[in-house]
């Protein structure tokens, strides 16, 4: 299948995770995940995601940036996309949050997935097969 034939045909294969978590104010992580489950037609168990990401039971308005990132990362589990485009996926995560991300990311790669990542923490990604698009003078990856 040639990408130039119909680029929109690949849209369902790509999942984007941005630097800023865009979450609906006034909702709890459970409510947000239930919405995403329905949107992505996922059979994931909400309570399992809440437990895996150690998400709080209060509204996102009261969450720290790290908690907000964890909520947004839970969405990757529901997307069922072959290609992930990730912008600073580990920024604002504590050590436990980063380990949870790496566990999810490793599962994605082992299942045949691909990730395109913009990061200031390249060493973590270099444990996988990596193609570096550009490296900044201070050894930082740059696209």
What is the meaning of each model-derived region?
Residues 84-88, 93:
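Catalytic Walker B motif of ABC-type/P-loop ATPase nucleotide-binding domains
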Residues 95-97:
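Helix N-cap at the start of a conserved alpha-helix in ABC-type nucleotide-binding domains
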Residues 73, 112:
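Hydrophobic anchor residue at the start of the ABC signature
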Residues 13-16, 20, 25-42:
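Q-loop/switch helix immediately C-terminal to the Walker
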Residues 59-68:
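Conserved ABC ATPase signature
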Residues 43-58:
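Conserved ABC ATPase "signature" region
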Residues 1-9:
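ABC ATPase NBD Q-loop/coupling interface
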């Amino acid at each position: 299948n040639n990408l130039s034939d119909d680029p929109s045909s690949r849209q369902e294969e790509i999942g984007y995770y941005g630097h800023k978590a865009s979450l609906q104010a006034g909702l709890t992580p459970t409510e947000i995940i239930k919405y995403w489950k329905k949107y992505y037609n996922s059979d994931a168990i909400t309570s399992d995601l809440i437990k895996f990401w150690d998400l709080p039971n209060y509204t996102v308005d009261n969450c720290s940036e790290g908690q907000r990132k964890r909520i947004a990362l839970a969405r990757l589990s529901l997307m069922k996309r072959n290609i992930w485009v990730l912008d600073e996926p580990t920024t604002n995560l504590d050590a436990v949050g980063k380990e949870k991300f790496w566990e999810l990311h490793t599962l994605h790669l082992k299942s045949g997935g691909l990730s395109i990542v913009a990061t200031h923490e390249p060493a973590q990604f270099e444990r996988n097969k990596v193609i570096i698009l550009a490296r900044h003078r201070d050894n930082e990856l740059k696209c």
